[in-house]
Amino acid sequence: MKIKKIFFIFSLATSSLIFTNSLILAAGSSDDENSEPVEVVDADYINGKERAYNGKYKAAIEYLEKSIENDPKNADAFNMLGYSNRKLGNNEEAFKYYNKALKLDPRHRGTHEYIGRLYLNLSQPEKAKMHLDELDSICLFGCDEYTTLKKAIEDFEKTKVVGNY
């Protein structure tokens, strides 16, 4: 009987220690450090992208240039600079920015779509198809960029009209 009582007390003490340690570990440290990485919002990029998609290309370029000053490795900002310049008819500038975006991120889907559209504007569907092939290898199960560029190429081949792709 005495052995059972000792065993019971020992078990109770052990369980109590385990429970207390679990609570301490669950509480974590008392400092304010966050172990999760904090995503920094680039207001210049967001404003530039919004203006570009609303047809305000010159204003977009101003914001996007500020964005790349702050983050020269932002492939998205370079892509949108290419987009804005393409829409303004600044083809050489557009190529410069698209190529920079692809140098930073060779698998950037948006850039492959947009540079493909630029090649269509210049009546170079074969080069557009090269970027469609890139998208095909990047988007294993399909993606909007692939579908959109494919349709633009098909439309170009049907009409042979150089437009604002």
Regions found by a protein language model. Give the residues of each.
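Helix-start (N-cap) detector for alpha-helical repeat units in TPR-like alpha-solenoids
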Residues: V41, A75-D76, R109-G110, G142-C143
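Structural marker of alpha-solenoid helical repeat scaffolds
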Residues: N70, L104, S137-F141
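Alpha-helical segment of the N-proximal tetratricopeptide repeat
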Residues: E39-N70
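Canonical tetratricopeptide repeat
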Residues: M80, Y114, T148-A152
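Terminal, low-structured helical/coil segments at or just beyond the last alpha-helical repeat
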Residues: I3, G28-V41, K129-Y165
